[in-house]
Amino acid sequence: MPRSNRNDNFIDKSFTVMADLIVKLLPINARSKEAYVYYRDGLSAQNDGDYAEALENYDEALKLEDNPTDRGETLKNMAIIYMSNGEEERAIETYRRALDENSNQPSCLKNMGLIFEKWGRIAEEDGRQDDADRWFDQAAEAWTQAVRLNPGGYLDIENWLKSTGRSNVDVYF
């Protein structure tokens, strides 16, 4: 049974009914509509913490979806799951794929930076300062791009860039 038929929450049910109606009325092909249903069910499963089901739905959506913006959004959600599951290398790879599809996703860059910064802290704690600096530089590169795409949207990151001396962003709000 599709996840959309299992929603117990009134708001979820209402959203699902409205989304189904909109999808039926939109002048898009059946393949794109089916991709959207898989994406929506993946998002619902992800919100419920059922990551395996979410990934299955996202995989199906990717097989059907041709729109790069929608593919990028689907890949971003998959990367978030990998990141939550501790599969950080896979998350980085998937964030990069998402950015290849749609480069205007600052949250992908922000999350990549979080992983790089974490790896830098671990290397620093282990006394591997050269590795730490390399990871911190990669975090700064990803975060600088994120801040440029979303000025003022990541104040904590902007502060980190400034306080570590890694800031080369010329626009702060």
From Swiss-Prot:
Keywords: Membrane, Photosynthesis, Repeat, Thylakoid, TPR repeat. Pfam families: TPR_12. It is a peripheral membrane protein. SMART domains: TPR. TPR repeats lie at residues 35-68, 72-105, 120-153. Its main location: membrane. InterPro entries: PSI_Ycf3_assembly, TPR-like_helical_dom_sf, TPR_rpt, Ycf3/AcsC/BcsC/TPR_MFPF. The keyword Membrane applies. It is found in: Cellular thylakoid membrane. GO terms for cellular component: plasma membrane-derived thylakoid membrane. GO terms for biological process: photosynthesis. Essential for the assembly of the photosystem I (PSI) complex. May act as a chaperone-like factor to guide the assembly of the PSI subunits. Belongs to the Ycf3 family. This is Photosystem I assembly protein Ycf3. It comes from Parasynechococcus marenigrum (strain WH8102). The lineage of its organism: Bacteria, Bacillati, Cyanobacteriota, Cyanophyceae, Synechococcales. The gene is ycf3.
